[in-house]
Amino acid sequence: MNIQEEIKKRRTFAIISHPDAGKTTITEQLLYFGGEIREAGTVKGKKTGTFAKSDWMDIEKQRGISVTSSVMQFDYDGKRVNILDTPGHEDFSEDTYRTLMAVDAAVMVVDSAKGIEAQTKKLFEVVKHRGIPVFTFMNKLDRDGREPLDLLQELEEILGIASYPMNWPIGMGKAFEGLYDLYNQRLELYKGDERFASLEDGDKLFGSNPFYEQVKDDIELLNEAGNEFSEEAILAGELTPVFFGSALTNFGVQTFLEIFLKFAPEPHGHKKTDGEIVDPYDKDFSGFVFKIQANMDPRHRDRIAFVRIVSGEFERGMSVNLPRTGKGAKLSNVTQFMAESRENVINAVAGDIIGVYDTGTYQVGDTLTVGKNKFEFEPLPTFTPEIFMKVSAKNVMKQKSFHKGIEQLVQEGAVQLYKNYQTGEYMLGAVGQLQFEVFKHRMEGEYNAEVVMSPMGKKTVRWIKPEDLDERMSSSRNILAKDRFDQPVFLFENDFALRWFADKYPDVELEEKM
């Protein structure tokens, strides 16, 4: 195997969107074209029992939302494609943000009837901060939506990114006739037996259709006043190519995939803590853990650490260094995924995502290296939780299951765990309420451990250096606790309590995460 050639073939990207914009449906269609599934499951068809292939966890199937990041791989047109399907629900932004550290590009799915929504904007900011290319898919043209020119304007005004349309819709909703493909200079037809037609046939096909007349006017306007196409600007994350289509009816998706693979970047390097960038073509293997997922197969109570390979080649059975612990590990049992199905990996290269079976060795953010290399990659973002719950086992006889469940789910990063310094009580912190619901559901369903949870409300969280800590600093306005790394932390009742503490202990430095 020529490793250089293999790395060049890799295209690793995440799909981001606001909930219900059609992200899971487009993922299904891409897998369909990659030959990974015989039929694309649709998220809406819940009563039929046909669930989306990429939504594999029980609670995701019930609620029609993605709450974990799935990793899926397929080959298409000479490229090896790695898709990371991210949680669309805002409470799961932590998992999503970490996933965005493991990709080289993003596909942003927008509901053409709703335009840019809150969660899309949040996720776009992270992508923009990383400077990776963004490809936009304006979805749901099979329904009535906003004017295409207005949607482009929103991209520029709300997200601050220039856009270039690769195709243009001819009507929408019941009047949807197809797409005017600007890149391939052809018509893509929504109705009838023929899939494509030449531009010259447009007048003959659509006659005096007012929508087609509007398309010609719009394109003339874009040619005169629109942005210029620039591959350089796309790769720099300054220009987003825009595709229109309908994921539900699988229209425009294959054209999008083919053009996307032409312009999406090959694997990037990754920055070490000293600022130096590790090149993907370095012969030495390196990678980092961006996600840990327990119970992908509930029958085996397993745990998988997802690793983005940054450089070199993975070979089954290889030994790696874990610089955080100073110890080594052997990578014998390694898999790649198609949602819940998996297959053993013999080798993989930079740009690939592999799943390493984990018995408690790894943490999110860990670096893996080989030989004399003991460097660490830049830390992944961590987040300060905003709401808290006390948690305990409902049945004292189930303490063992309770502790195992908490340990595994906390290591995934789905919730954060704190322990009251004085009482030893467990407290959970999360970015949003849904995280607690998922935690409770999974504790009961996967660990057979019912839990009692009582709200503590919002808290303002600050870490304190162990050497600065005096237990007498604890008061009725704060709770002194330890995080899961045994670092001391204060949970303040509100900002006033925090200011009161800062005034009382002016020499004590408190730290806030992201």
Swiss-Prot record:
GO CC entries: cytosol
Tagged with keyword Transmembrane: no
A GO BP term here is: translational termination
| Residues engaged in binding GTP | 17-24, 85-89, 139-142
Keywords for this entry?
Cytoplasm, GTP-binding, Nucleotide-binding, Protein biosynthesis
Recall the GO molecular function terms of this protein's record: GTP binding; GTPase activity; translation release factor activity, codon nonspecific; translation release factor activity, codon specific
Provide the protein's localization. Answer: Cytoplasm
Q: Name one Pfam family in it.
A: EF-G_D2
**Which segments constitute the tr-type G domain?**
8-268
Query: Is Cytoplasm found in the keyword set?
Result: yes
NCBIfam families (alphabetical): prfC (TIGR00503), PRK00741.1 (NF001964), small_GTP (TIGR00231)
Q: Which PANTHER family match?
A: PEPTIDE CHAIN RELEASE FACTOR RF3 (PTHR43556:SF2)
So what does this one do?
Increases the formation of ribosomal termination complexes and stimulates activities of RF-1 and RF-2. It binds guanine nucleotides and has strong preference for UGA stop codons. It may interact directly with the ribosome. The stimulation of RF-1 and RF-2 is significantly reduced by GTP and GDP, but not by GMP.
The similarity annotation says: Belongs to the TRAFAC class translation factor GTPase superfamily. Classic translation factor GTPase family. PrfC subfamily.
Protein name per the record: Peptide chain release factor 3
Lineage from the top down? Bacteria, Bacillati, Bacillota, Bacilli, Lactobacillales
